Amino acid sequence: MNEDIKNNLNNLDEFSGKIIVGLDEAGRGPVIGPMVIASVKINEKDLYKLQDLGLKDSKQLSKKKREELYVKISEICNVKKIVIAPEKIDEQMEITNLNKIELSAFSKLANHFIKENENISIYIDACSSNEQSFSNQFKAKLINKNVEIIAEHKADENYKIVSAASIIAKVTRDNVIEEYKKTFGEIGSGYPSDPKTKKFLKKYVHENKGLPKIARKSWATSKNLLKEIEESKIFQWVK
């Protein structure tokens, strides 16, 4: 990590009119539900308000704590979100990959704030293993190529502004999952490794001979379940 950048971000003795933006996502890997991209914007002189909240990466917080912080962050910062539905993810995965889908959403949110203020620094949780390449691709999509970009792995742990975006994204996705449960019952977290999610999908597919609309059909988990159904049909026909 660039310690000079980090120290400069957290140095609140010198106020300026600079705008700080944090970007992060939630729901990149699940087989069920949307991917949420969130951005939070704050004036550099107001960063202490976020620091006073004791922010952490959303994964390190309880559900109750995340929800409490969501409200406080929304009061302090300008918050914007993009919710990419499962069917939209499937549609885009036919022509591109998840990194580029995420990158496109990140840049759309960033450009919204750049239009309002060019004196801006953007902190972003890099979704690529190559931070520099990710940073270059992100900057290429911006309407102003001169803005400061800090793209790092685990930025949600290292910078409060990204922690805030992480919490906004996570709570937004969790709320969508809770709405799904009202219709479909227990579906778990939506992640392929979750036994509850696997149980729900397998039961649904076998009973309905297809996937629910809340599932990402382009995911290996979904494809394997559909393959099981097809093989079952063939077996019954041969039998």
From Swiss-Prot:
GO terms for biological process: DNA replication, removal of RNA primer; mismatch repair. It comes from the Archaea. Residues 18-231 form the RNase H type-2 domain. It catalyses: Endonucleolytic cleavage to 5'-phosphomonoester. GO terms for molecular function: manganese ion binding; RNA binding; RNA-DNA hybrid ribonuclease activity. A divalent metal cation binds at D24, E25, D125. GO terms for cellular component: cytoplasm; ribonuclease H2 complex. Its EC number is 3.1.26.4. Its cofactor is Mn(2+); Mg(2+). Manganese or magnesium. Binds 1 divalent metal ion per monomer in the absence of substrate. May bind a second metal ion after substrate binding. It is found in: Cytoplasm. Keywords: Cytoplasm, Endonuclease, Hydrolase, Manganese, Metal-binding, Nuclease. InterPro entries: RNase_H2_suA, RNase_HII/HIII, RNase_HII/HIII_dom, RNase_HII_arc, RNase_HII_hlx-loop-hlx_cap_dom, RNaseH-like_sf, RNaseH_sf. Its main location: cytoplasm. NCBIfam families: ribonuclease HII. PANTHER family: RIBONUCLEASE, RIBONUCLEASE H2 SUBUNIT A. Belongs to the RNase HII family. Endonuclease that specifically degrades the RNA of RNA-DNA hybrids. This is Ribonuclease HII. It comes from Methanococcus maripaludis (strain C6 / ATCC BAA-1332).
